[in-house]
Amino acid sequence: MSPEHTHTHEHPLPPSGNGTVLLDIGDGVGALVVHAPDGLDGAGLDGVEIELSHRGERQAFVHTEVRERRLPEGSVYAGVFPAVAVGEYTLLGLDGAPDHEVTISSGKVTEISLVR
């Protein structure tokens, strides 16, 4: 959590199933999917909130929770930002410092991976 993000979520959300995530993309709006470690190596982010800021700023304006996503080919862990205005953004690390720069394009889904 960044210093500005002061609340926590007491009840982790259960895994989501195939087809249960709705993206609201179109003219001037895209989405961001952040693939995360699965936790088998101890580095998992399941249940952790990840935050997005406007590029050049360190204050998050939106956050989402990394969750298990159950797909026909197996489970993956990801955080989904379903509707983000076109622009330049920074995914903040757990310490609130800039971690990944991303560009959101109109009507498209941008994907990045935190899996190392």
Language-model segments: what does each one mean?
Residues 58-78:
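Short, acidic Ser/Thr/Gly-rich low-complexity loop/linker segments typical of extracellular
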Residues 1-65, 95-116:
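Primarily secretory-pathway and cell-envelope proteins
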Residues 24-26, 71-73, 81-83, 104:
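A generic structural micro-feature
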Residues 12-15, 70-73, 91-92:
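Short, solvent-exposed secondary-structure boundary motifs
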Residues 76-94:
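A short tyrosine-centered beta-strand micro-motif
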Residues 42, 72, 87-90, 108-110:
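A generic structural micro-environment signature
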